[in-house]
Design a protein with these regions (language model features):
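Short beta-strand/loop segments at the ligand-binding rim of alpha/beta enzyme cores
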Residues: 188-202, 334-335, 356-365
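Extracytoplasmic/secreted cell-surface and envelope-processing proteins
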Residues: 133, 170-172, 210, 290-291, ...
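Active-site phosphate/pyrophosphate-binding segments
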Residues: 143-144, 216-329
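N-terminal export/assembly segments and adjacent metallocofactor-ligating motifs
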Residues: 1-227, 231-260, 266
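Structural motif
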Residues: 98-100, 160-164, 201, 280-282, ...
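Short, surface-exposed connector motifs at secondary-structure boundaries
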Residues: 90-98, 274-280, 332-335, 359
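Phosphate/diphosphate-binding loops
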Residues: 12-14, 179, 183, 200, ...
Length: 376
């Protein structure tokens, strides 16, 4: 008989509540937890594929301790987990300890990290793809102490302008909630519902899932996205009187590179302004901070903040993996705990881990495989 349990899968951009089916203690199927209404029981491709990791033939089968032989070859000896925890407790008490992990929105992990930092342990994060760059840039530009994440409330939006933001695909955060809330505004059960539908304008470099359902789509090179955003912002901020003359002149100058799309931009702005507080402008997380700021300014001018979009503060760490490497070189970090990921492999092009490992007195790696990061 199958058994079921509730869990969640944290990631760098959020977490997904799950229901896992298991047989004889082995998970066999992953589905979304229907009790979490924003996602409606849906999952993403990564959650569905995660069960395969449990059956990876290269998955580590226990705890190991590295022993360096005189020949220079490393040999792995299987040891008890309790012995590793005992040595870890002793080493942590000596100070100069750092934690290195992937970015995660796990609330439990955040709580534990705060307790560790209270004892003087430094915390660093690294991801192969930095999805949080736009959040940090926007937060810095707005004078916030932390990063600022744009969280659209598409269930309340009647007009949406997407600037290379695939909010229905897996390129942006919160895509499951976005899909459920946005598509809820496109249901037509009778002829009268057509007038109540939301309307989507998409400007993008390639065909995305979001572009596939757009009412109006403009194909535009990513290199021209800043110019187009400036073009739209100049007209919208001018009509709402939300910017002074000097700024508008500067925006028009920047938007000259997209002047051929002036008619498209003007029609879009007119439609956005026809639904104040029910319109929203979304910028792709990969776009530069100038576009992020322009999207914020347009949402503020539309009265959308708090209505169709929220800006929330995100957590932060003591620094990047580069700052960690510098602290190790300077002798300020002597003990390193690596939580998941494979940072040694992903950063070997710009961090000399062989040199750093000579300065580290103690390294513990928590992971599912014996890989490059385990070798240090």
């Amino acid at each position: 008989m199958p058994a079921y349990y509730a869990t969640s899968q944290p990631s760098s951009r959020g977490y997904i509540p799950l229901i896992v089916e298991s047989h004889q203690g082995r998970p066999t199927k992953v589905e979304g937890n229907p009790s979490y209404l924003p996602y409606g029981g849906s999952t993403d491709i990564y959650s569905q594929a995660s069960v395969l990791d449990l059956y990876d033939p290269d998955r580590a089968q226990g705890s190991f301790s590295r022993q360096s032989l005189k020949s220079g070859v490393n040999r792995w000896k299987k040891v008890s987990t309790s012995s590793i925890l005992e040595s870890l407790t002793e080493e942590v008490s000596n100070g100069k300890v750092a934690l290195l992990a992937n970015h995660s929105h796990s609330l439990t992990r955040q709580s534990l990290i705060q307790k560790a930092k209270a004892k003087g342990i430094k915390f660093f994060e690294h991801d192969v793809v930095d999805y949080c760059s736009a959040e940090r840039q926007l937060g810095k530009a707005l004078g916030a102490k932390l990063g600022m994440r744009a969280v659209p409330k598409l269930g309340s939006a009647k007009r949406v302008l997407s600037l290379d933001n695939d909010f229905l695909g897996n390129r942006e955060a919160n895509e499951l909630a976005n899909s459920k809330s946005f598509m809820g505004g496109r249901k037509v059960l009778n002829p009268g519902d057509a007038k109540k539908m939301n309307r989507l304008y998409v400007v993008e470099a390639d065909l995305s899932r979001t572009g596939g359902v757009a009412d109006h789509r403009l194909r535009l090179d990513s290199s021209a996205m800043t110019a187009f955003a400036s073009l739209v912002a100049a007209e919208l901020l001018s009509k709402t009187k939300a910017a002074d003359g000097a700024l508008l002149t500067h925006l028009k100058k920047l938007g000259a590179g997209a002047k051929e799309h002036q008619a498209w931009a003007s029609e879009t702005v007119a439609d956005l302004l026809s639904r104040p507080k029910q319109s929203v402008v979304l910028a792709g997380s990969h776009l530069p901070k100038e576009v992020q700021l322009l999207a914020y300014a347009m949402n503020r001018a539309l009265g959308s903040i708090g209505q169709t979009i929220d800006y929330i503060e995100t957590n932060h760490t003591d620094g990047s993996i580069d700052s960690l490497a510098k602290l190790v070189k300077d002798g300020e970090i002597e003990r390193l705990i690596i939580l998941g990921g494979n940072p040694v492999y992903h950063t070997k092009g710009f961090i000399n881990w062989e040199e750093l490992s000579k300065k580290l007195k103690y390294v513990v790696r928590l992971g599912s495989s014996i890989d490059e990061s385990s070798q240090i």
